[in-house]
Amino acid sequence: MAPAVQQQQSGGGGGSTGAAAVGSTTRWCPTPEQLMMLEEMYRGGLRTPNAAQIQQITAHLSTYGRIEGKNVFYWFQNHKARDRQKLRRRLCISHHLLSCAHYYHHHLAAAAAVVPTTKLLTTLNPSSSSSSCGGGLNEDANSLLSPTSPTTPTSAAAAAAAAAYTTSYYYPFTAAAAPPPPRTSPAASPLFHYNQGGGGVVLPAAEAIGRSSSSSDYSLGKLVDNFGVALEETFPAQPQQPATTMAMTAVVDTTAVAAAAGGFCRPLKTLDLFPGGLKEEQHDVV
């Protein structure tokens, strides 16, 4: 019986010691005075105190409240970890800000480099600014080159001067095969080709009418067709007609004459065909 009572007593004593151990492991709640002193020591440069320093700090802070040596050790360890986290967070924020600034700096530099390039392209290819003047020049060139463009006095004179250099055949007393050049203004006098001395001469309308009326004194028998056939026997001499009813000189293009004469090898000689008739008419011509 006695050993059993001893075991119960020993078990009861163990339970009391366990309760004391549980009571001793309660959470430490530092007072404001203890926290202020610990922070002053930390700002003073103390980061990892040794065992002797921990005992001294514990003895000094025990006057302001309950504290143990392990509480002092863990406080310094946790405070260093919090400082490292704060420093790491600050470094991350600063690195993020620097990367953003670097990115925006390069983006703005690229945009600033693109703007002068676009300005240079607009100066090299002034499509919008020179569209009006370029369009005017193109319209002028097209009006000069296009055959359907309206005739101006300058272009009509240039066309008449160019036509003067082409080889043409003229029929003074026949009806005009083609209408005269279009007139742009009533003041502009049209130009006509006049056959004088075997060559075409450009004369105004009034002078051409005068010369054609003066040349009507000659008979048609004295004129020879372009292909060498005399027209005296076919058409008798006609009296002089008024200048107002006389037809203007018609200009036949070189291409049309070449197409009409394509079937002949060469013009016929009038002396071989009608030697006698021409000799009799030489007195009148002289």
From Swiss-Prot:
Compartment(s) where it occurs, according to its Swiss-Prot or TrEMBL record: Nucleus
Domain of life where this protein originates: Eukaryota
Molecular function in Gene Ontology: DNA binding; DNA-binding transcription factor activity
CDD domains per record: homeodomain
Keyword Transcription regulation: yes
One GO BP: plant organ development
Region (Disordered) location: 1-25, 128-152
Transcription regulation found in the keyword field: yes
DNA-binding region positions on the chain: 23-87
Family: Belongs to the WUS homeobox family.
Reported function: Transcription factor which may be involved in developmental processes.
Protein name (Swiss-Prot/TrEMBL): Putative WUSCHEL-related homeobox 2
Organism: Oryza sativa subsp. indica
